C-alpha cells in the first residue's frame, strides 16, 4: 500500500541534468510501494531547459528537440516549476534543506576558463560562454554586443562549442534567419564582415574533443571552404588514429578530406591550426592581432600527452577572439566547493557532509560529455537519493498543506516568481512571434520583457 505522506524534492536548475533527475525521481516513485514524491524545480531564469535553450546552437534544432521530453515531465501533476528565483540571493541552501526532504543541485558550469595571457580582457576578446549566451538570447548576455565588423576571427579551443561559434560566425545570416537565433545577433551578423575564422588548438589532431558529426558538417556550409594544412597530419598513421578511439579515427578521416580541398575564389574560410597556443592579444584599445606560439607534443611518465612550447612565435592580424577552452563550475554560497575540480564534492551524488543535498550534471562531475551523458549521471544520483529516502524514518515530516506553504514562501522571497503558467505564456508568445517568419520561436532577450509577457 502506498503511504499517504509525500516526500518533497527540490531540484535547483532546469537544464538537462535537472529534468533528467526529475524524470528519474518520478519514475522511481511510480515503481515504489513505499514512496510518494512531489518535485519543485527552481530556476534562476524565467525560462527552463538550461543549455538546451541558451547553449545549443540555433542551427541544431534536432538537439533542441529533447525539450519535448522535458515538457512531458513538466506535465506530471507532481511537478512544479518556479523560475526567476536565485539560490544564494532570494533563498539559501540551508533553508531549502530544512523545507525539503531532499535537494538536488543541477546548476551546471556557469563560468569559463581563462587563458591567463596578456590582452585577454581587451574589447574584442570574449568568452564563448558569453558569446553563445549572446546569440542565444540569454538575458544575462544580451547587452554584450561583440564587434563583428572585422575580417578575421580566431576561436581558441578544439571542442564542439568552438565549432558552434565558428558556424555562427561564418554562416550566411539568411540561413540563420530561419532559426531561433537572437534577433540582435542576427542583425549584427548581417553585414558579413568576417571572411575567415581560424580555429586554434594547443594540442594535435589526435587530441581534439570534436564529435565527428559537428566536424563534418562544416563542409556543408554554403560558400565556405574548410582548410587544413596537410603538414599538420604528417606522422599520423591509420594505426595511431584507430588507437585513439573510434571518434578520433573518424575525425582524422574528415580532417584528411579537408587537406585536399582547393580554396574557391570569393569563398569565406575556416582554417584549422593545431599545435598552436595563444601567447598574447595585442591592440590599442581593442583586439588587433594575436601572438601565437608553436607547440610540440611530449609524453610524461604517466603516458599523458601534453603540449610543450617550442618558442616559435607568429603574429596574426585578428579583430575578434573567442575563448572556448572549457566551462567552470561556480560555488553556490552555503555549499562546499572544490576549486581544483570545479565541482561540489560528493559521494555517488550525495554532497559530502550533507544529510539531504545531492548533485547531478556538470557541478557533480565537471563539464564533460554531451546532453545524453547527463541522463545516466542523474539516474545514479537519484538511485542514491531513493535509497536514502527508503531508509529514512517513515513518519510524516511536513503537514498535508506543505506544498502550498512552499509556494507561498517562494512567492514571499521573490514577488516576481515565475510559475509554469507564466512560462507557458512566454513560450506561446515566442512561438507565435516566430511562426509568420518560418522560425521555431523569436526569443525574448531580456529579463524585463520575459517577466512582462509571463505575468501578462
Swiss-Prot record:
Its cofactor is FAD. It catalyses: 2 reduced [2Fe-2S]-[ferredoxin] + NADP(+) + H(+) = 2 oxidized [2Fe-2S]-[ferredoxin] + NADPH. Its EC number is 1.18.1.2. Gene3D superfamilies: FAD/NAD(P)-binding domain (3.50.50.60), NAD(P)-binding Rossmann-like Domain (3.40.50.720). InterPro entries: FAD/NAD-bd_sf, FAD/NAD-binding_dom, Ferredox_Rdtase, Ferredox_Rdtase_adrenod. Keywords: FAD, Flavoprotein, NADP, Oxidoreductase. Transmembrane segments: none annotated. GO terms for molecular function: ferredoxin-NADP+ reductase activity. SUPFAM superfamilies: Nucleotide-binding domain. It holds the Pfam family Pyr_redox_2. Monomer. May serve as electron transfer protein and supply electrons to P450 systems. PANTHER family: GLUTAMATE SYNTHASE 1 [NADH], CHLOROPLASTIC-LIKE (PTHR48467:SF1). Belongs to the ferredoxin--NADP reductase type 1 family. This is NADPH-ferredoxin reductase FprA.
